[in-house]
């Protein structure tokens, strides 16, 4: 397998995570080209803009994965966007598993025939290409979500990411920073339990109480569904891989058999080879249309949960500010600072509540449209493959019965 791989911009990129994100947006973003160099992928990001804060109407830059993560982190850390669902960061490109499989295949090629080796090598190269295309698509969806959002697309760092032609000098997070992020996640989870459990804070809006209950359960269920969908997809892929040796064995046996059986064995060998290709397509389609979609919305639902936590934290701060103001008035000391603090907390809580309600409704609409589109397409593809498999078996049966 080549260590460098390039995807042309006019090739179709798989997209299972969304329906038409860009529409009539004044900011159109796409990844027109990508090059893989061992562990790094360089994405060519092309932008067409009708927004006044860009210097040009069309421009392109080359970005790496770490720069996408930097952009995501700047949104998460910006208080201005606390009331918004921040689109999930794209996953890190990971081609190591495919490379290891190919290396093991090369090391153990003495135990298999040249034909088996060639077919298995083609399968692994196709797997590598599929991972590469999905990597490009996930990075593109992240940018398109930002570009389609009326608030997020006006962010200064987003403009820099899209327009600044030089390298952003963003390095990969070190071990300490990764552990720090994990620690913050643990602290946040503990804080949420403390707010809702020990302190006994009561939700003041039924809409958000319902959304929080729903998202906690939904996130768990979509994670479990994703794991099971992955197992089904891998089963189809394993079946496809297992057709290779049986096809080769039948073909080899056919060359040794008497003429009355030779054609039958060769016909069966051809059947298993064509079934292998069909099973491979089934696995690929289930991975793209189901597993990838579930995996994306597992991350997106986590982003929605993060939004609800920020609002809940704002509610707790507002309640604490009210208590502090009551104490200040009782003691008749530092009343004005307590009033200012209470007003700021109130304003922040109301601002987050207003934007969060719209964001959660948009999340529902986006999720329904995406699932409906992909599940319909998956069912159509499953039917198409089932018909092809049935026709293949029927033709093989006719051929076998017609032999003397």
UniProtKB/Swiss-Prot annotation:
Specify the domain of life of the species encoding this protein. Answer: Eukaryota
Q: Which UniProt keywords apply?
A: Coiled coil, Protein transport, Transport
Residue ranges of coiled coil: 255-336
Alphabetical list of Gene3D superfamilies matching this protein: Arfaptin homology (AH) domain/BAR domain, Phox-like domain
Q: What are the GO BP annotations of this UniProt entry? A: protein transport
Its job = May be involved in several stages of intracellular trafficking.
Give me the stretches of Basic and acidic residues compositional bias.
Answer: 1-10
Q: Which residues form the PX domain?
A: 21-168
Q: Which CDD domains match?
A: BAR_SNX5_6
Family statement: Belongs to the sorting nexin family.
- Comp. bias regions, Polar residues: 11-20
* GO terms for MF: phosphatidylinositol binding
Q: Which InterPro entries does this entry report, sorted A to Z?
A: AH/BAR_dom_sf, PX_dom, PX_dom_sf, SNX5/SNX6/SNX32, Vps5_C
Q: What is this protein called?
A: Sorting nexin-32
Region Disordered, as annotated, extends over 1-29
